[in-house]
Amino acid sequence: MPINKKIKKVLVIGSGPIIIGQAAEFDYSGTQACKALKEEGLEVVLVNSNPATIMTDTDIADQVYLEPLTFDYITRIIEKEKPDGLLPTLGGQTGLNLAVELAEKGVLDKFGVTLLGTNLEAIQKAEDRNLFRELLDDIGEPFIESKIVDNLKEAVQTAQQIGFPVIVRPAYTLGGSGGGIAENVEELKEIVTLGLKRSRINQVLIEKSLYGWKELEYEVIRDGNDNCITICNMENIDPVGIHTGDSIVVAPSQTLSDKEYHLLRMASIKIIKALGIEGGCNIQFALDPEGLDYYVIEVNPRVSRSSALASKATGYPIAQVSAKIALGLRLDEIKNIVTGKTYACFEPALDYVVTKIPRWPFDKFSKGDRSLGTQMKATGEVMAIGRNFTESFLKAIESLDIRLPDFMEDLDRESLENRVKKAYDDRMFYILQAFYNGVKPEDLYEWTGIDPFYLYKIEEIVRLSLKISSNKDKILKGEVNLLARAKKLGLSDSMLGRLLGIPDFEVRDLRLKYGIKPTYKMVDTCAAEFAAETPYYYSTYEEEDEVEVSDNRKVLVVGSGPIRIGQGIEFDYCSVHAVRALQDRNVEAIIVNNNPETVSTDFDTSDKLYFEPLTTEYVLNVAEREGITDVILQFGGQTAINLAEPLSEAGMNVLGTGLKSINLTEDRKQFNQVLTSEKIPTPPGYTVFSIEEALKLSHKIGYPVLVRPSYVLGGRGMEIVSNEAELKTYLTDAVKITPEHPVLIDRYIPGREIEVDAISDGNDVLIPGIMEHVERAGVHSGDSMAIYPARNLTTKQTRRLVNYTKKICNLFGIKGIINIQFVLDRDGQFYVLEVNPRASRTVPILSKVTGIPMVKWSVRIMLGETLNQITTLKGLVPPGDLISVKVPVFSFDKLLGVDIHLNPEMKSTGEVLGTAENLEQAIYKGLKAADFDLPEGGKVLFSLADRDKQEALGVVCRFIEEGYQVLATRKTALYFQKRGLRVEKTEDPVGLIKKGDIKMVVNTPTRGKEPGRIGFKLRRIAVEHNIPCFTSLDTVEMVLQALVRVGEEEKKEVIPLSEYKKGGVLV
């Protein structure tokens, strides 16, 4: 079928910032789609608010807009660009909802824009719970007993008719947002109230709970000629009742009979055909574990998180094929670019097993609600491939980059039963513990509902582990059969080291001595029936190896692993650009990573991809097989940097900044000595190894002090403590201080934080830009709003900052990228807070707003070039004409029990960028892009700590002057009233928020982070009711500026990336 010749320009809407439920998978799918459209000769216009994405690079689309993903802004872009078509299904739920809104409100008709691929009616039928149920009824497919409601009274009546427990599912939401399982009327009222607010059409489905049934997913694709194939079927190990994004998922399914498999496959094809979806589609089923009864749970009429997993699991490029189908091509006309020979109409075949395990943020939020249900809580996921389930399962656990719990603890049977009956993020580890304690698989099936197949396989891991522990001496003396069996089962060197009581590297030496080495197999979509042109490998312990090794110069790039707080998509952006930079210099680029959501693990990003855990063992195995000595770690976040020492000790050459310099930045004593010797101020600080030493040195420094563990990312475990009692609590509860795990203690210096990213070749230094944080020191840089260019530095201060940066680069022998964080105190004195000898999360932002390809130039330096050979630019690059504001984005609504108060520990999951000709407009855009519902009037509630009340006087006055009605809690109101301000006291702030009377909350915490305190309750209730809540007066001042100084016309202005005038570089 020929492509529609009327379509010459296509608009693609991205998914926006990384949030729980919508992560990097849409950068991957959007990038693939844009490339597919350009291959067909179409002009592509892309709009996305997330600057940390590959898809917002200027070479991905012909025109790129970093603008808020709202109806008004997209309408303005359509008006300006006049696209012929809109691709609605590759930007996640955000992109889909916007496309529907644009169609329903007549914008697409007005400007002559055609929805490509799946049409409006099909989207509405899949997303509207009522229409979808009617369709299933028409085609004879079973659906769960349920009813659509749009009010609380009807919800209660429906639940009582169906019988508790019930599941609540809001329409047009992502990640199960606003949904949940209700056991009683009280829980139902709470969930439905939030669900109705989250739904775009104020509609929720109340359905009978099938908790405990098997959950299966089918990824299906259909073209406009009604050709349809299934790409992959996936089985959730966790039964129905846990969101699939929080479930451990296996592909292909392991426990279905042939009859069950084909029953659900035919149902999937029947449903996608009835809906008329053109492109990829995900269909979820509940299957009775005792028979052939099944129900359709839901359909995603778009590329989804599961699509990304299915793509990486099979090698089938779902997003690329979906984009071509949207243009009118048939499956039998689209080449499979993995094999280069077959066509997209061939169903993939798998001769291996894939396991996905979610990555949760509870290492950051230990007090958050860790229970799992229908609302997703994971920030990211890992994927592993093996020849059997246990191998892929254990490799996935190894990929999580978490400290594995110690087993063989003395837990009684009742405690274990309680820990596994209800699903928590760590349930699988307690299942392992139960097997260590002798619990039978049959009992665990009764407790968990997990299919016995998986339980027996997990028991096999424990049985072998116990055997290895009891035969330790024999193994160390050369009895290697058990060792070889353990490697085939999937046990890593580190797991074996713990069982044998020896270091990892000794396990490695032992197995290499006896020739126990991995082989590598290829993922090719066709189980080796055809040769693949895009090498994509995984390790296993078998005889035949499928890797073809070249004699080219090659470099290994270590990726950043799963998306998590503190290490997000920004590092994948850097890894992808590192690969491209190597390829530009004719160096073979080989990447190791384990995140199925990302562009770095796409089939055609690198010369070779190894889908492996990011540990010393697996990285060295790849390096040894490929004959690689050079490795780049600067772009994989802290995960990669932590490998510098073991890889160097194993003989690998870490390109760029050396191991000595990396260690120097983390050793606080040496770090301070080096900077002090060059008269560069640092806050007084020490590395301490015991509680006694910490108390003594904190007293010497003087409170408040900033405390944190060494070698962490995202400020994990970082706090400001004000006295000795708080310090003792921190050292006993938050971290475990030992000689092996010291704690850093610095004096806390109040002031403004300034952030510098620089490129150095060891002699010359280039500073693309300086960013200034809005919130004062004490809020993690990832959680701060940040302005480029810095606006409050004098010429003299800027010169001093540049001078310090150059000195630091030279002192630490920086080759490549460096990130330095300064604080400017009230007396105008700079202090160096932190030096990161690696890429930071601001690299993508500065690269885009300055036009300087920071990663590319850094890689060239690592390969031996100097800055002089690369560019004529030196020192600080002059800023362009525009102002950009980075605004962090949080997922607090998904994480119950987590305090939203900002502090030195990072909490945001993503960020957006607002760019404009003036600061207020840039702030306004950034806040809109971050999905803040900014009130232009109404009631604003203040509840402030005593220390902040005087400072807040000016802000409160301005809110009143602008016509807002200011309310306050009792003590705060009394303070303002005494000073003559028109502030109304409220005794029931929580009730007012719940009723929807309050439009904004300003709450600065006192000493309390405890859930019982009123401040904590205020913050949580505001978040759960989608009301803007700010915990910093600095932020509130900026918000107020944006609200009162930006005119209606300014609010609608859009600027493509190509029109950014950048420091002498026009991109």
Swiss-Prot record:
UniProt-annotated stretches for the region Carboxyphosphate synthetic domain: 1-401
GO molecular function, one term: metal ion binding
Keyword Magnesium: yes
InterPro entries registered for this protein in UniProt: ATP-grasp, CarbamoylP_synth_lsu, CarbamoylP_synth_lsu_oligo, CarbamoylP_synth_lsu_oligo_sf, CbamoylP_synth_lsu-like_ATP-bd, CbamoylP_synth_lsu_CPSase_dom, MGS-like_dom, MGS-like_dom_sf
Annotated positions binding Mn(2+) 4: E834, N836
Chain residues that bind Mn(2+) 3: Q821, E834
Family named by the database record: Belongs to the CarB family.
Protein name: Carbamoyl phosphate synthase large chain
Classification of source organism: Bacteria, Bacillati, Bacillota, Clostridia, Halanaerobiales
